[in-house]
Amino acid sequence: TLAAALCLAGTASAKVTDFVNPFVGTTNFGTTNPGAICPNGMMSVTPFNVMGSDLNVYDKDSRWWSTPYCYENKFFTGFSHVNLSGVGCPELGLVLTMPTMGEVQPDHRIYGSEYTGEHAEPGYYTCDLSAYGIKVEATATTRTSAERYTFPAGRGNILVNLGEGLTNETGGWMRKVSETEIEGMRMAGTFCYNPQAVFPMYFAIRVSKAPAKGGFWKKQPKMKGVEAEWTPDNGTYKMYTKYGREIAGDQIGYWFSYETAEGEQIELQMGVSFVSCENAWENLDAEQKGFAFDSVREAAAASWESDLSRILVNGGSDKDKEVFYTALYHALIHPNILNDVNGEYPLMEND
């Protein structure tokens, strides 16, 4: 085997994950991303920065840009979920989650923020949102995400945006399950512009704190004439403050709003499934027991250390080891798991 062919080396305290640079390949059409993922994981949580700003060097679908992240871009519009790495066509990158401050603004071009303090390592990503003073962090299990937002004092919000994403497919629905839980489905597909290759992705979301307020939004069609005169949300986003059961459409979303204290941390976790919402909840409850972001992060790091350290090398420089272990890291992202914890597997072809 390759492991046997290489010389085993390294000190007991050295970690091979220290040599992984998740930012390698995130520029010049390298098509990778620095998001949090476990080896061969179905879930990945990636900073989404390819829409909404004239400052972006590359935008979604610009010159075949096919990933949710570009290293040169600095306009964060949320974490996207279930992302592809190393592919040449845009797909997935679904269900954006975004913390903000102040009045709820559902338009990603307005609520998006520049960011600083970016850092990534296997199984973990973080940055600071300049517009809000919010620190965002993400990690993952095989089928679920764990996200932590550290807020300043004021009105803090968590937005769940179903309208935007990397996929060229549109449409979905959301349902309020409880004050702290929502579920839904987002259509995906048309990979490499195959218009009939479509499929649903189901999700289950839980937040760690009950909001003071919450609700759906939906972008309304542009009307003309008399209808336009009596429609206050004509061509804009309608905020549903009294209706709160379920909603469907293309440009839809949900918000949780809080009165946050300085430094208050609120967590969000998401389970996904390509079979059903029931399976998404089952995946979430099986892989995360309550809210324990740091424990999930530690487990993700340990899974990468275990898989990558199957091959230990000596000789060469630290830069050589970075090249080797970063390439091995990327090789262990795909192919990825698609079955749920109960063993059910999606039908990937059209019915």
Task: Please place each PLM-identified region on the residue numbering.
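Accessory carbohydrate-recognition regions in carbohydrate-active enzymes
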Residues: 14-351
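Bacterial N-terminal signal peptides
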Residues: 1-9
